[in-house]
Amino acid sequence: MIPRTLAAGTLTLAAAGLLASAPRAQDVRRGAALFAETCAACHGADAKGDNGPNLTALWAAGATDDRVTQTIRGGIPGSVMPPSAATDEEIRAIVAYLRTLAAPPPAAGETARATPERPQRVVLVTASGEDIRGERRNEDAFSIQIEDDGGRLRGFLKKDLRDIVRGDAGRGVPARDRAGADPGIGYRDLLDGLKDPSRWLTFSGDYTGRRHSPLTHITRENVGRLAAEWTFQTGTVTRGRGFEATPLALDGVLYVTGSNDFAWALDARTGRPFWQYRRELPTDLTYGAMAPVNRGFGLLGDRLFMTTLDAHLLAFDRRTGRTSWDVTLADYRVGYSATVAPLVVDGKVIVGISGGEYPTRGFLDAYDPASGARIWRFYTVPAPGEPGSETWPAPEAAARGGGGTWMTGTYDPELNLLYWGTGNPNPDYYGDDRKGDNLYTNPLVAIDARTGVPKWHYQFTPHDTHDWDSNHVAVLADVTIGGAPRPSTGSGRTEPVEVRKVVMVANRNGFFYVFDRRDGTLLVGRPFTDTTWAREIGRDGRPIVLNDGTKSCVPDQWGGTNFNPPSFDPALSLFFVNARETCATFVPQAPKIAPGRQNFGGVVRVDREKAYGALRALDPATGERRWEFRYPSPSMAGVMTTASGLVFAGDNEGNVMAFDARTGANLWRYATGNPIWGAAPMTYLLDGRQHVVIASGATLLSFALPDRAGS
């Protein structure tokens, strides 16, 4: 049977010669008939999408004939699309037909939204009479985007301008030669985090990972008037995933990455692009084709930093979108990829790696932001003789032991410690050839930012056989702990009340943890979802395991939560997370291991009958639930809070919502039309108005109160 759901896909079949020549007319006719019979029910009669994604946009989004062919051949793990039993000729015919429906892809670096083909000098005359000279980057009937002669990207609404004078060819000088040029972002700016509410400079907004904004323009009283301000359609598609990036905001510009290694600089007022970047990717991607996502930029000076699906780290000039340097992290052909949003700390760009479903060895790297030279590397699976190597049975198991680092961590500048989670051991579900705890897979690791040496670690799921990566945002805060029995021990012993410097993690295994971030002391360890695999955390800090998953286990392989970011409101001292209530049976199988080949080591049978999702507020002092708001299905959306007492979240049904952080009462919702997968809201102040932005499907949406209503 030919599968019914298709999205941009994976490995090349060029060697098989399936698509070596131009499509023949008879192939197109046969492909149209096969598509109507087996694919149209999900993808629509015109292939523009129904329950399944739009297939006419695949090539414009960077897919190739080879990738689409392999997606049909192999299916999409974890989705309703199984591997296909179709013949090579049938697959070739379907791809040939789809190719006739596809628009041509944009050229590399080309902006897809009416960017002027030739540069044009302009003088913008503001309402106050100020002349702003620069080069036009984009324009529509209502707005214009320029790079001014100081090198700043600036967007204007035409209603706010007195005049636009065009063709000012001789009156400008190169931006870098002018006084008052954009000074860029320094380390001090990153340390300040969200003190300037017009900015959002890191993946989580600041180094703490709280995703908590000081803005109060949108309140419990007026959030019901929140309305869509603009949308930006990326035109990219993923394999049943979503648009997972968090934009960075600086001086009225949003910098955002997308699927298939696209990236844009957008006018934060209108969503119109100043520039677009598109990476030319190899056709034989491994993990990068399975999950062609990207989670965002890092920022320092006038440079942006981005990882790529073929496991590179790039530096861009943020004014132009042109690359400054390009370094290789690892060999993508083995199974490596990179999707993490880099974290820039003092003199270093910190990046992780993906590929734990392949025979890879995870690591975390630090690079010089000026040159791209590597400063240090921490391997998440130790070499023979190193601390932790005793938890692996043989060097060959450790050499392919997994432990990816694909979610952005957090940073305490006072302690100079990075807090980073790592992923599952490899193979995911089959553990017979890797007896032991398998360090450092599935822990939180506190790493010296200067040297890359781990200071302490805590392993959430020793010897994991459930694919419960610990790639979560670890949230830093100062929390009052004590005065009640410690939930991690259940001993009834009362602890003294004190304010502790903590790091908090809602883990994929269904437990919520609070540690002293200075030394890793476990303060709280308590389930925040139903769990059948473990009863509690024992006195030794290890889970008391009840069920290995082969007899139905809670949670499933996607976990009690996943990489979708949580949030923390320091005024309320509440931790907010989208929880998943799920169940599955894990069936381990010995895999065939080879470079570039996925090896999950089994299958998972998910019971969806009773599954649901919930936004939950947790007390970090005890781990107790304060309130919840339920969704009909598990959500993979992230969370954001604001100082006005609001929680913003999303769900799998495509709703972006606002809640009263104190009670969980729903105050506002907007139906985006696509599941919100992995993305979390962010917010910024512009022209005296607070904007809330979130990615949904392949679209970025911005919301604000009507003009002056929130000022």
Set out the residue ranges of the language-model regions.
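Loop/turn-rich, solvent-exposed surfaces of beta-rich toroidal or solenoidal domains
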Residues: E581, D607-A665
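Repeat-blade elements of multi-bladed beta-propeller folds
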Residues: W200-S204, G240-F262, Y287-L313, S337-Y358, ...
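Structural recognition of the beta-propeller blade-terminating site
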Residues: D267, D317, D368, D448, ...
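Beta-propeller blade signature
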Residues: F363-A373, D437-T451, D519, G613-D619
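Conserved blade-ending motifs and adjacent loop-strand segments that build the rim/top face
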Residues: H463-T465, S470-V473, T529-R535, G541, ...
